[in-house]
Amino acid sequence: MLLSKAQYDEIALFITTLRPTRQCMRRLKERFPCQSQSTLLSIFSQEYQKLIKRTHAKHHTPEAIEMYYARYLNEVARDPTVPILLELANEVDFSPALIARTVLERFLQDHDGQPPTKPILSSMLRDPSLIPDPVLANQVHLCIINDCCNGPLVDGIKHAIGHEHEVLLRQKLKEHNLAFLDEDQLRLKGYDKTPDVILEVPVAVDGHVIHWIESKASFGDEASHNTYLHDQFWSYWNRFGPGLVIYWYGFIEELDCNRERGILLKDGFPESLVTLGSCMAQNAEHGQHTKSRLSETHQETQS
């Protein structure tokens, strides 16, 4: 699904009025019924990540951490059944999963007498039953399952969706009888930074020859696309030549401006692509047709 910059900006502006809850997607879909839910969810997630980056520092000052932890202790002493951390996250307009991580880290520092290691903290967020306090474990669990943009649950879903679309890409290539090397095969050959697939024989898409394809199970906005260009796409271009990027959930159409330089954008697997074999067949057919016409013309001239 392609959006103009103006359409994208309208969606992004509306997202600033929403909080990262499961209900926000219903409001977003009601406001933009013509857009697919997967596209809207991808845009929402990316816009919310930008907000998190902008406000992350103020929620992690020593003063903020102590305030959140004290608030949790006071509220839980009053009524441990209330979703305190979830309500706190909504109140300060920050990610529930990240608020839970902050309070859990502070709790473990009190409990163990020293800050927890990152692996321990991450394992407890993935499996709150490992948290030594059952009340806090439940509070963290509520934050994790109610955060639609951050946390181990969301990370797992994103990873699964990304893998699913990589599998879809490989299936499409096989359906078109296109030989390719995937990331695992390329790493065995010693490549460290590679696209998802490299075509063993280049193909033409919209009149442009491509050597590789990168799958992105996300929406291509300006910020993410420019980051990918800098960190990935131009590196692929330098090493392997021109290629194709598939943003499965759409992109801002104005970003597809590097075709002549060798990077094409699509929002799905190309409907029409031209292989070297089909080119040769077409050329042979054209040559045979031309030869026949010349022969006919010669015979007409002789008669």
UniProtKB/Swiss-Prot annotation:
Its main location: nucleus. Coiled coil: none annotated. GO terms for cellular component: cytoplasm; nucleus. It is found in: Nucleus; Cytoplasm. The keyword Transmembrane does not apply. Keywords: Cytoplasm, Nucleus. It holds the Pfam family TPD. It comes from the Eukaryota. May play a role in erythroid cell differentiation. This is CDAN1-interacting nuclease 1. It comes from Xenopus tropicalis (Western clawed frog).
